[in-house]
């Protein structure tokens, strides 16, 4: 049974992670997580101490659990790009500090690193307004560059063709014919999937209510540093991981909001695109890194249709749109121990598949503490 430990600074509670109900489960991994959470309280998404918090949590997990695979994920640069008008000197300080703390973590542990910058950010050029369509539409709180049309009417397509900022329109039928996705993925696809030009953000039902100052660029390549093997494509990262884990401890360090322009290590540019779709620092980006499979081989599309069955019986209530925990992620490899830490919330436990994952419990910048997820036994 998967278990969640929620730490709200003054109290902790243990829940059945699948149902959300209170649990009295006990185990060595639960004890480890409870001790670590109790000693390090999450300072908030926009606080630079969140970088230190991430590193301290990772060091504690390394000391107490001794995993062979460690995910360390930093969201701070992303938060400061999207939600703040960050001056250039302040931005440099943030990026320098993330890489300084990364170096410290690697210096005091025995991990061989794979360091990934998920991509540069750009100023918003304009908004693509969907409210004037006659059909139903969906935006995505996690993907600024994708949207979907549900139950469309033909004249919507004429309007879409004339909208500034839309780069691609692909029908559900064409998508399925081209990519042969899983049935679960196909079931959730909208009638039409839309993607935006660089700098354009979709606005509509499901988009973020907070004002964004920057959004992910059209990052056709992202920086990857590692001495463990050649990484030409984003799907190569998992292959390099698997090979190295046969005889080494590996740390996969992921830094959001940092691309080729600001990366502080020597790097090889890694292909970050498949056909018309460019990964944009959403959960699909992480899942592709962790599984070695492109987004259309997962179960949740970039913009997902809501289904009646999702609400008939709600499961994994702390996992956002994910109604399952993938079993093909790197952390689910049966022959290794794995752990993950992130100051991004909701999806790190999903995408890492780690035995123990500690992540921030903040929603839309509102800090409610931190949460540890103890995964099902392998």
Task: Label each region the model flagged.
Residues 1-378:
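Feature captures the catalytic ectodomains and active-site-proximal regions of enzymes
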């Amino acid at each position: 049974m998967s278990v969640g430990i929620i730490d709200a600074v003054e109290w902790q509670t243990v829940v059945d992670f699948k149902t959300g109900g209170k649990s009295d489960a006990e185990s060595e991994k639960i004890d480890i997580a409870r001790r670590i959470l109790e000693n390090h309280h999450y300072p908030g998404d926009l606080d630079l101490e969140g970088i230190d918090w991430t590193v301290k949590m990772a060091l504690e997990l390394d000391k107490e659990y001794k995993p062979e695979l460690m995910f360390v994920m930093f969201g701070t640069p992303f938060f400061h790009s999207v939600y703040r008008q960050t001056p250039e000197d302040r931005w440099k300080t943030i990026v320098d500090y993330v890489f300084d703390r990364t170096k410290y973590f690697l210096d005091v542990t025995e991990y061989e690193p794979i360091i990934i910058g998920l991509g540069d950010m750009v100023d918003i050029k304009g908004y693509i307004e969907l409210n004037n369509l006659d059909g139903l539409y969906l935006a995505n709180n996690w993907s600024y560059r994708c949207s979907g049309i549900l139950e469309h009417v033909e004249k919507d397509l004429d309007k879409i063709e004339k909208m500034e900022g839309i780069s691609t329109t692909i029908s559900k039928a064409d998508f399925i014919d081209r990519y042969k996705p899983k049935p679960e993925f196909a079931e959730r696809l909208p009638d039409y999937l839309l993607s935006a030009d660089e700098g354009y953000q979709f606005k509509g039902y499901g988009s973020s209510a907070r004002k964004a100052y920057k959004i992910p660029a059209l990052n056709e390549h992202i920086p990857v540093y590692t001495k463990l093997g050649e990484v030409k494509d984003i799907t190569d990262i998992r292959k390099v991981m698997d090979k190295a884990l046969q005889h080494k401890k590996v740390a996969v360090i992921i830094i959001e909001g940092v691309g080729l322009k600001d990366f502080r290590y020597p790097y090889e540019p890694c292909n970050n695109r498949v056909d018309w779709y460019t990964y944009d620092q959403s959960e699909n980006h992480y899942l592709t890194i962790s599984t070695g499979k492109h987004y259309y081989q997962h179960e949740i599309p970039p913009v997902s249709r809501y289904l009646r069955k999702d609400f008939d019986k709600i499961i994994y209530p702390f996992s956002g749109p994910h109604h399952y925990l993938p079993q093909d992620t790197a952390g689910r490899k049966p022959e290794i121990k794995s752990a993950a830490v992130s100051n991004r919330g909701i999806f790190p436990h999903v995408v890492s598949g780690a035995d123990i994952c500690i992540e921030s419990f903040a929603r839309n910048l509102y800090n409610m503490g931190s949460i540890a997820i103890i995964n099902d036994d392998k």
